[in-house]
């Protein structure tokens, strides 16, 4: 009895399905036109600072300070992808290199989120004080803080002397970032000012070429010693 019921129900279903298929075939399917993306949304650092109008005054550093559109990021964090190969850090966004420089010394080692907050706060302070794009101020500070000439030790026949040498563009950027971060860290030690405020002051003074900047003073000292060892 149950088998007869199953067979009859299957026959009824087989008669209904073709009828439904015919009804569906008559329906007109409307599709939405595909939307074309005419232009990509602009990527701004921290959602505020654009990088399309940044200019680098020193032509020798244009390939080593990455601030163009293809290096734009919302946050200065790339999970170390530029550390896999030698000299690839030249393509690392310059703000991320500045953020990583703040993580030096034991007390700040590995605290990337804290360093990002410091840079974000410092950029807001720079914008309030100068009414300029903080990215442009940072680039100007790095260009002005990198020493063009340094001295090295040369030994011959047991005598050691110092010889003036030219500094490569990548090392100029490396030393500029290190001097700026060191100056901000030392200024904030045992001071009522926060690290973000000291970093903003250091970047503004370095961008102006002022002697109040730790990086500018150290750069002038290195170049003066190198000049005496020519």
UniProtKB/Swiss-Prot annotation:
InterPro entries: Ribosomal_uS7, Ribosomal_uS7_CS, Ribosomal_uS7_dom, Ribosomal_uS7_dom_sf, Ribosomal_uS7_euk/arc. GO terms for biological process: cytoplasmic translation; ribosomal small subunit assembly; translation. It comes from the Eukaryota. Residues 7-16 have a biased composition (Low complexity). The keyword Ribonucleoprotein applies. GO terms for molecular function: mRNA binding; rRNA binding; structural constituent of ribosome. Keywords: Ribonucleoprotein, Ribosomal protein. One of its GO terms (cellular component) is cytosolic small ribosomal subunit. CDD domains: uS7_Eukaryote. Residues 1-22 are annotated as: Disordered. Belongs to the universal ribosomal protein uS7 family. This is Small ribosomal subunit protein uS7B.
């Amino acid at each position: 009895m149950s088998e007869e019921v199953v067979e009859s129900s299957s026959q009824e279903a087989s008669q209904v399905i073709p009828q439904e298929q015919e009804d569906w075939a008559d329906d007109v399917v409307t599709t939405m036109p595909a939307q074309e993306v005419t232009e990509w949304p602009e990527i701004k650092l921290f959602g505020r600072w654009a990088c399309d109008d940044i200019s680098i005054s020193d032509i020798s550093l244009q390939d080593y300070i990455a601030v163009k559109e293809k290096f734009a990021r919302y946050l200065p964090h790339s999970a170390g992808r530029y550390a896999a190969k030698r000299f690839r850090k030249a393509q690392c966004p310059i703000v991320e290199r500045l953020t990583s420089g703040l993580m030096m010394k034991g007390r700040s080692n590995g605290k990337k989120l804290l360093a990002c907050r410091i840079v974000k706060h410092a950029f807001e302070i720079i914008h309030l004080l100068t009414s300029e794009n903080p990215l442009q101020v940072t680039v100007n500070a790095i260009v002005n803080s990198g020493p063009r000439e340094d001295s090295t030790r040369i030994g011959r026949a047991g005598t050691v002397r110092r010889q003036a040498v030219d500094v490569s563009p990548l090392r100029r950027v490396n030393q500029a970032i290190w001097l700026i971060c060191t100056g901000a860290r030392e200024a904030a030690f045992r001071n009522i000012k926060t690290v973000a405020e000291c970093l903003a002051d250091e970047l503004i003074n370095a961008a102006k070429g002022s002697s109040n900047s730790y990086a500018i003073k150290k750069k002038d000292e290195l170049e003066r010693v190198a000049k005496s060892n020519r």
